[in-house]
Curated annotation (Swiss-Prot):
Residues involved in ATP binding: G122, T123, S124, G125, K126, T127, T128
InterPro entries in alphabetical order: Mur-like_cat_sf, Mur_ligase_C, Mur_ligase_C_dom_sf, Mur_ligase_cen, MurE/MurF_N, UDP-N-AcMur-Glu-dNH2Pim_ligase
Organism lineage: Bacteria, Bacillati, Actinomycetota, Actinomycetes, Mycobacteriales
UniProt organism field: Corynebacterium glutamicum (strain ATCC 13032 / DSM 20300 / JCM 1318 / BCRC 11384 / CCUG 27702 / LMG 3730 / NBRC 12168 / NCIMB 10025 / NRRL B-2784 / 534)
GO MF annotation list: ATP binding; magnesium ion binding; UDP-N-acetylmuramoylalanyl-D-glutamate-2,6-diaminopimelate ligase activity
One GO cellular component term: cytoplasm
Name of the protein in question: UDP-N-acetylmuramoyl-L-alanyl-D-glutamate--2,6-diaminopimelate ligase
Major location category of this protein: cytoplasm
């Protein structure tokens, strides 16, 4: 718990402007938050930041924010508060987000300094790498916290969260909760948004791990170079967010570039690049399970048995191993732990006794879609079909390439709705379909492209199409259990829909495939 005077003088330093005289005192501060409806205690500061439509200061008198003992805002927020006749202490800074991380960390007692913190960033593979780290660390005898896309866990207990990387106040409160539970290691996914917006500011990272970089989030980042620079905040020596140590997969040009700017880096490769950690002797079973050897510094090697299919998961596992090694985790135990990993909605097999392969995967960016389809092609003797869509209000430039790459690899591409959000679903589908048709024209094999807006129906058609020895994948939503359409989230789980369609097919209840387009 921090008093208001120390917060203003010590943490905000010279950034504070226009602080009313009655703001200076020994008022105890136990929490800070951005959400007016969920501020956790009355001994709290409400942080009011500008939003896309309104300024957060407009909500200072509503819900739990009305009980806050002070308000942290910028000059524009101060104007709003003055017009509303605000009488509570108002701390004014140039940029609230720039100081929010450090302030939040201090209020909660700098919790990330009390455990080993490992951050995983990159376009694809963050969730799987984090799961591999969690299980490996647990097998090595550590008490582990996990923060990521599929949720948050404290020593195996689920904790609800909304974002891949929570806002700084929520994150520091989570860290404090983990510290108080005796957690020794925390693994978290760190998005480019989190780095750019300062959500992880004030956090002390022992290791940062970089998976890869490919097209995504170009609605937020104007260029791929800008996207790279956001990730590089975790690795550059001159960045305030730099981790103490870094591990970087150098199997693509972006990884090689990241390694070249990193401060204290060890490298990873599964494709024969010169690296500190490498994977060799890779063997793949008929089920897709993999065994391989990780070669570590000082001529050490470790045998790994991995249930997860795909060459990209060998890379994820080797990166996870390297990150753990950098903080002194026992390698043999860590390797054993990775063998136990299954990740919801990531290459997740759905088996109802059918004689073809059915998979649900979170792939929702071009490179990920290509990697999943390439992996499945190696596991089947027959044809390959995919249901694919693209999210609304997100990077629109990846829609065509997702369709194109799908049709270059599959025999059947069914374009459907993903999460349209506020966009017109047909407009999104048209872009994906155009890409798929282009890919079909470029393919050496005959490719059928269908457009079926109803996602459940698209899945039913895909399942009915499949014959013995074929493979099908429903891509895009993975672990998600809702579909966001026009501001409303409807329950929808790809895994449930695939199981239902398989059950109907096996019970001979599905109608024959009809021509749909």
């Amino acid at each position: 718990m921090l008093d208001l005077t120390k917060l203003i003088d010590g943490i905000l330093k010279g950034s504070a402007q226009g602080v009313p005289a009655h703001a200076v005192g020994e008022q105890a501060i136990a929490a800070i938050g951005l959400d007016s409806s969920s501020l956790p205690t009355s001994d709290a500061i409400f942080a009011a930041v500008p939003g896309t439509r309104t300024h957060g200061a407009q909500f200072a008198g509503t819900d739990n924010a009305a009980k806050a003992v002070a308000i942290l805002t910028d000059a524009a927020g101060l104007e709003v508060l003055n017009e509303a006749g605000e009488t509570r202490p108002v701390i004014v800074v140039d940029d609230v987000r720039a100081v929010l991380g450090a302030a939040s960390s201090s209020i909660y007692g700098d919790p990330s300094k009390d455990f080993t913190l490992i951050g995983v960033t990159g376009t694809s593979g963050k969730t799987t790498t984090s799961y591999l780290l969690e299980k490996g660390l647990m097998e090595a005898g550590h008490k582990v916290g996990l923060i990521g896309t599929t949720g948050t866990r404290i020593d195996g207990e689920e904790v609800p969260t909304k974002l891949t990387t929570p806002e700084a106040p929520t994150l520091q409160a989570l860290f404090a909760r983990m510290r108080d539970h005796g957690v020794t290691h925390v693994v978290m996914e760190v998005s480019s948004h989190a780095l750019s917006l300062g959500r992880v500011a004030g956090s002390h990272f022992d290791v940062a791990a970089f998976t890869n970089l490919s097209q995504d989030h170009l609605d937020f980042h104007p260029t791929m170079d800008d996207y790279f620079d956001a990730k590089a905040l975790f690795f550059r020596a001159d960045s305030p967010l730099v981790a103490d140590k870094q591990v970087v997969c150098v199997d693509d040009s972006w990884g090689q570039r990241m390694a070249s700017v990193a401060a204290d880096v060890q490298t990873v490769s599964t494709l024969g690049q010169e690296a500190d950690f490498s994977a060799t002797d890779i063997n793949v079973s008929d089920s897709g399970a993999q065994s391989f050897k990780i070669n570590a510094p000082s001529n050490q090697s470790y045998q790994v048995e991995l249930a997860l299919p795909g060459a990209f998961n060998v890379a994820n596992a080797t990166l996870a191993f390297a990150a753990a090694a950098r903080v002194g985790v026992d390698g043999e135990a860590f390797a054993r732990g990775m063998s136990k990993v299954a990740v919801p909605g990531r290459m997740e097999r759905i088996d109802e006794g059918q004689d073809f392969l059915a998979v649900v995967d979170y792939a929702h960016k071009p490179a990920a879609v290509a990697a999943v389809l390439d992996t499945l092609r190696t596991q089947i003797d027959g044809r390959l079909g995919v249901v694919i869509g693209a999210g609304g209000d997100r990077d629109s430039t990846k829609r065509g390439p997702m369709g194109q790459l799908s049709a270059q690899r599959a025999d059947l591409v069914i374009v459907t709705d993903d999460n349209p959000r506020s966009e017109v679903p047909a407009t999104i589908r048209a872009a994906v379909t155009a890409g798929a048709q282009q890919g079909a024209s470029e393919s050496e094999r005959p490719v059928e492209v269908l457009e079926i807006g109803d996602r459940a129906e698209a899945i039913r058609v895909l399942v009915e199409w499949a014959q013995p020895g074929d493979g099908i994948v429903v891509a895009g939503k993975g672990h998600e259990v809702g579909q966001l359409v026009a501001g409303v989230t409807h329950h929808f789980d790809d895994r449930e829909e695939v199981r239902a369609a398989l059950t109907e097919k096996l019970n001979n209840k599905l109608p024959l495939t009809t021509e749909e387009g």
